[in-house]
Regions:
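Bacterial Sec-exported substrate-binding components of ABC uptake systems
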Residues: 2-75, 189-226, 286, 343-345
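Extracytoplasmic ligand-binding site segments that recognize negatively charged/polar headgroups
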Residues: 91-96, 142-146, 154-186, 219-246, ...
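Structured C-terminal subdomain patch of bacterial secreted/periplasmic proteins
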Residues: 174-185, 189-191, 198, 202, ...
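Short helix-initiation/N-cap motifs at beta->coil->alpha
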Residues: 48-49, 107-122, 162, 261-271
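A short, structured surface patch at a secondary-structure boundary
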Residues: 70-128, 133, 253-256
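Short secondary-structure boundary segments
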Residues: 66, 138-139, 161, 285-289
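Proline-aspartate-enriched helix->loop->beta-strand connector
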Residues: 123-136, 271-284
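Alpha-helical, coiled-coil/dimerization segments enriched in small aliphatic residues
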Residues: 116, 237-266
């Protein structure tokens, strides 16, 4: 996502728009929580996925769309501006996100399930909440399309990692964990919460660097990242274009799943391909739809040959929270956790 002011008040203002240039339009901004007022320049334009969305004033009533949307709003320092959240698949966040959310009141949590029922929010409710922005991955179609939101005075903004699934021909690099703190800085500039966003982004960068440093000391092992989505026996995996791949890279794990595989586009994976690859390590993500490690292991053990793989034989089966699969601070936390667990084995 790139940002730019949509007007030029003066030459110097244009050059410093996102660094705190004050303009007459900024005087009309809405205040929200400890992050406002400020001297950021509005209106701005956010560019993402080939779209361009005008943000007329400092967002004060934000709806978090999907796990990525909610987590990034928190990381950008704007949790106190959320009026509602939806589409989160029912799993808890890690401490950095969950603790912040629990400290706040008044955020409407729209019920959402897992599996095919991703959970949504009615457009009528969006209007009732008087939202001025919906940010996140769970939008882009129907009433929640970028154009329809804009026609109703609501800025619909998506993180760049959502582009591939929302717009034909768009691409997203999920494995690039460095893009996570970079986007938080951009989001902080858009929401005028730059100080907190930059501090959180710097902490993420330090944690990621530490994970890579420690991970570089580990032996290279073959691994597969797996998960179950619902009560069926359909098994899903993480290919090369996933945050799990970025986590694997930090931990010196070689992904045995075909690089081109993407669960969103290809559906369930053949369990036999995992067995044949004989991974040294199995990473199992849990949490969404109420899926537990015990439940996942029970299903995996029914797959012919799975218990004979090196991962089962050597008891190298590691659980990560489902949040690890999303390009948020939780993926960076998971990288550190995985490196730590591998070092202990």
């Amino acid at each position: 996502m790139t940002l730019r002011p949509s007007f030029l008040a003066a030459a110097t203002c244009a050059a410093l728009a996102l660094a705190g240039c004050s303009t007459g339009a900024a005087a009309d901004r809405q205040s929200a929580g400890d992050n406002a007022p400020s001297n950021a320049a509005y209106p701005m334009k956010a560019s993402f996925c080939g779209q361009e969305v005008a943000v007329e004033r400092e967002p004060a009533r934000i709806i978090g769309a999907g796990r990525e949307g909610v987590a990034n709003i928190v990381s950008a320092g704007a949790a106190d501006r959320m009026v509602a959240r939806f589409g989160e698949h029912g799993a808890l966040y890690g401490p950095r996100i969950e603790d912040e959310l629990k400290s706040l009141s008044g955020i409407e949590e729209v019920a959402s399930g897992g599996g095919e029922d991703h959970g949504s929010i009615s457009f009528e409710r969006v209007l009732e909440l008087q939202a001025d922005m919906i940010y996140g991955s769970a939008l882009g179609e129907g009433d929640l399309s970028i154009d329809n939101l804009g026609n109703n005075g609501i800025a619909g903004v998506m993180p760049p990692s959502s582009c591939a699934y929302a717009f034909s021909g768009a691409k997203s690099d999920f494995a690039d964990l460095d893009a996570i703190p970079a986007h938080i800085r951009e989001l902080g500039a858009l929401l005028n919460t730059g100080e907190r966003a930059n501090a959180n982004a710097s902490a993420m960068e330090a944690d990621l660097a530490a994970a890579r440093e420690e991970g570089g000391k580990l032996p290279e092992l073959k691994a597969a990242g797996l998960y179950y989505w619902d009560s069926s026996d359909d098994l899903f995996a993480y290919g090369a274009n996933s945050t799990i791949q970025g986590i694997f890279d930090a931990a010196r794990l070689k992904n045995v799943v075909a690089p081109s595989y993407d669960a969103m586009f290809n559906g369930a994976i053949s369990p036999e391909t995992i067995v044949k690859s004989n991974p040294d390590v199995l990473i199992i993500t849990t949490g969404e739809s109420g899926i537990t490690l015990e439940d996942s292991l029970a299903r995996l053990e029914k797959i012919p040959g799975m218990t004979q793989t090196a991962a089962f034989t050597n008891k190298r089966i590691i659980e990560l929270p489902s949040g690890a699969a999303y390009p948020t601070v939780e993926a960076i936390d998971a990288a550190r956790e995985l490196v730590k667990k591998l070092a202990q084995q």
